[in-house]
Amino acid sequence: MTEPPQTDEGWFVLHDFRTVDWDAWRDAAERDRDRAISEGVEYLRSHEAVEDADEGTSAVFSVLGDKADLLILHLRPSLDHLSTAERQFEKTELGRYTAQTDSFVSVTEVSGYVSDAYFDEDEEVDEGLVSYIEGKIKPELPADEYVCFYPMNKRRGETVNWYDLPFDDRADL
């Protein structure tokens, strides 16, 4: 089997998709809804604040379609940090009005497809390339209301496997 390319890993990512229990929300007393909103805003502010400390970032996005209402996205330096962020939301009053419909855990990375020189300690790497690569392994989340997300898996069934192709062929794709 062909070897996968060398990689450099960055932050771990949790894509936490949630639906809102709209019936429970409408039935809740106004003070309970206000408290839920207040706790939700405080939760997000405290998790967005880690961006200033170079410990990751978080954001909430609206989801179109019928699979979820919200995407809470966390990027952190470890899986433990992701677990903590997820559990803290579940403890909020707002979390009581939501249910996780799906979640994906991944890690940001760059590979030798980007540049062999980046992985060669003897090579001098262009500063622009280094900046580009650092942006890939520690990305900044957009200040947008919507994002496009699709789960990526380069393994396609039992017989067609991306990693069966030689490195140069994969790099050309």
In which residue ranges do the predicted regions lie?
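An N-terminus-focused feature that recognizes amino-terminal "leader" regions
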Residues: M1-S58
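Long compositionally biased, domain-poor regions of proteins
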Residues: P5, E39-E55, L75, L79, ...
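Short, surface-exposed beta-edge/turn micro-motifs
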Residues: W11-F12, A68-L70, E145-V147
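Structural preference for beta-strand elements that scaffold enzyme active sites
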Residues: V13-H15, D102, V147-F149
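Hydrophobic, ordered structural segments
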Residues: R18-D23, V60-P142, M152
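Short coil/turn segments at secondary-structure boundaries
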Residues: A28-E30, E86-R87, D164
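Generic detector of short, locally flexible boundary/turn motifs and exposed helical patches
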Residues: R33-E39, G65-L70, Y113-D116, W162, ...
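Surface-exposed interaction/gating patches
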Residues: E127-L173
